[in-house]
Amino acid sequence: MLTNFTRSLAARSRRLSRQWLTVLLASVLALLFYGVVAPVLSRAESSQAKVFEQIWQTVNDNFYDPKFNGVDWQAMRQKYAPQATQARSPEALAVVVNQMLEELNVSHTRYYTSAEPEYYQLAGIFWQRGIQRQLKPFLPNGKLEYVGIGAYTRDVGGKTFIRAVLDGSPAARAGLKVGDQLLSVDGKPFQPIQSFAENADRPVKIQIQRTPDAAAQTIAVTPKRLDPTTMFLEAMKSSVEVIERGGKKIGYIHIWSYADDLYQRQLEQELSDRLSQVDGLVWDLRDGWGGAEPSYLNPFTAPALNITFTNRNGTKGRFDLPWKKPVVMLVNQGSRSGKEILAYGFRQFRVGKIVGSKTAGALLAGRAYIMRDGSLLYLAVADVSVNGERLEGKGVAPDIDVPFTVPYAQGSDPQKDRAIAAVLEAIAKPDQS
């Protein structure tokens, strides 16, 4: 009996020891969490809170409207600061900040992190305008670039679709098309930066769906390092086409960005070179970035001088600038800012038809501000009117409206097709253009 009692007591002691050991381990883990992990989370919360405060203050000091478009800006700070403090990453903070900025209900006002192509593209636009010194410390080797494929995307109903492809880009060369649904990249969900960051000049497998009922297909694409200060000029050069229809030659050029006068110089060079012998022109201002100046209409509106060059052998060449042949402007909801000024003037001066869909109605003057963590705040700092008319929130409607649905478009471009037809109509009946 005593032996059994002793054994029972020993077993109970072992159970109690295991229970105490479990409690002890749990306590140690808790101490480790609060001693190591919790301070890290606390520092992250503190960092996000400081960035949030800097963003709020920058808007408070620089937003173009001292009445904040009717929004109680002080109240916005109280509303969103607690959420910002809980953000665990820059991307999570961006969600909160952009919800706050959207309360202002204006264009040219958004917050970007390095997880977005627009971050680099805007940095490229403002690179020579005062942000270079601020941003360089946050860039690998101080160099502004990102790895990508040159495709713009849009989320529709929880699915990601290609809405535009830069001419000459890796996406274009691989055969990706507007309307393709992006399913995965190397078996993982598509991310515009992360999916390609470690794959410069190395093929990746992008799984797409081209129609709603088609089987998925895989396309190999080789991402490359993109320089935001030059990528849009390269795409513009690659876009130039001479299209033959009905015995006529139609020139085509796509201006992806107008945020520097170098794009206008390139346009004028193309008009006097590769496009000099065409019978009419499609001037595509869809998507990309704005920044255009009213003077960019001059090639199509100013009085023309006809200059003829005669070589020794008698061959002749003509140089006509400004342009006197029919021209059609192509716009859509991605045509914004300065491009909308061009569309407005194009109509006012009766240069030609505007084809496509209504422009963005995003006409304010924006400026880039670099935050303490290297993120970028794009902020509206001045109101803009054209001939006394505000286009912000209104946009410019086309003369010929051509609806276009992105999902599963299979690379079709009915807007471009209609613009070409409009040029042919203007050639046939020049007085009615």
Question: Each predicted region: which residue ranges?
Answer:
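PDZ/PDZ-like domain segments forming the peptide/carboxylate-binding groove
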Residues: R133, P140-Q191
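Conserved PDZ fold ligand-binding element
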Residues: A171-I193, V282-W283, F346-F349, I354-G356, ...
